[in-house]
Amino acid sequence: MSDALYESSIQSLPLLGKGKVRDNYAVGDDKLLIVTTDRLSAFDVILGEPIPAKGRVLNQMANFWFKKLAHIVPNHETDVTAESVVAPNEVEQVKGRAVVVKRLKPILVEAVVRGYLAGSGWKDYQATGKVCGIALPAGLQNAQKLPEPIFTPAAKAEMGEHDENISFDEVEARIGKELAAKMRDISIRLYKEAADYAATRGIIIADTKFEFGLDENGTLTLMDEVLTADSSRFWPADSYQVGTNPPSFDKQFVRDWLEAVRIDGKPWPKTAPAPKLPEDVVQKTADKYKEALTRLTGEALQ
């Protein structure tokens, strides 16, 4: 388990905050060091066991997509290396899992795009025939491809709370009509381009979540992580079947285990603390992440 980093401890930079998976440090006034740890969250609860090398997989995958999609929208990348901003004895903590990025003003709306009906989208549809207020054709099945990708935003929740799906009208009310439309259109374009590429690698991107910020000139900028196995639902195309949940390349394996586990005979209530993950679940999840990276990018973990 020596390859796992549950929590970073960078003493040479001011800590700004720790999210579910990432630890953020200030680099001067205009940049951040983002360290992607091996923490795993499911149902908005951080689990107690790290998934070895998961942070490095996510980091490499996000960097791959930032470069691939840079022609669509500016992103937070800089040419400063993580190793150059920390003390020599801290380099091991950042190697392969950290980036130095532009400090942006975050837009507190998660830009979710769905190309398929799955997860909470499928539950919404079963109950109302809609997803996030968007009416869909009748008679769709679980995991079915939608006629066109849809933009289904969510309000960013406080740590430990569940993100809440909101309507596009609500997004307009929060950030203004022009910015809302731009964010929606760019998100759908990013999704379509990524999904078309992934299809050539035998992977379906069922849905994904983008995060944006504004730079000092008010320019919409892609940030955080992009199209990783944490922010997206990846399905292997060869085992895809409408009507059933395909085995995904992401946290679904852990989610399914958590849904099935019983504590004193009762289901886990999806609140902290999380039950301890068995060793085989940890290992299988680590393998899934690495497999997603290799299949999608053609690169091994560096």
Curated annotation (Swiss-Prot):
InterPro entries according to UniProt: SAICAR_synt/ADE2_N (IPR028923), SAICAR_synth (IPR001636), SAICAR_synthetase_CS (IPR018236)
Presence of the UniProt keyword NADP in the record: no
E.C. number(s) listed in UniProt: 6.3.2.6
Pfam families listed in its UniProt record: SAICAR_synt
PROSITE patterns: SAICAR_SYNTHETASE_1, SAICAR_SYNTHETASE_2
Keywords: ATP-binding, Ligase, Nucleotide-binding, Purine biosynthesis
Keyword Ubl conjugation: no
A GO CC term assigned to this protein in UniProt: cytoplasm
EC class (word): ligase
A GO molecular-function descriptor: phosphoribosylaminoimidazolesuccinocarboxamide synthase activity
Gene Ontology biological process: 'de novo' IMP biosynthetic process
Superkingdom of this protein's organism: Bacteria
Pathway: Purine metabolism; IMP biosynthesis via de novo pathway; 5-amino-1-(5-phospho-D-ribosyl)imidazole-4-carboxamide from 5-amino-1-(5-phospho-D-ribosyl)imidazole-4-carboxylate: step 1/2
Reaction it catalyzes: 5-amino-1-(5-phospho-D-ribosyl)imidazole-4-carboxylate + L-aspartate + ATP = (2S)-2-[5-amino-1-(5-phospho-beta-D-ribosyl)imidazole-4-carboxamido]succinate + ADP + phosphate + 2 H(+)
Membership in a protein family: Belongs to the SAICAR synthetase family.
Protein name, per record: Phosphoribosylaminoimidazole-succinocarboxamide synthase
Species, as recorded: Cupriavidus metallidurans (strain ATCC 43123 / DSM 2839 / NBRC 102507 / CH34) (Ralstonia metallidurans)
UniProt lineage: Bacteria, Pseudomonadati, Pseudomonadota, Betaproteobacteria, Burkholderiales
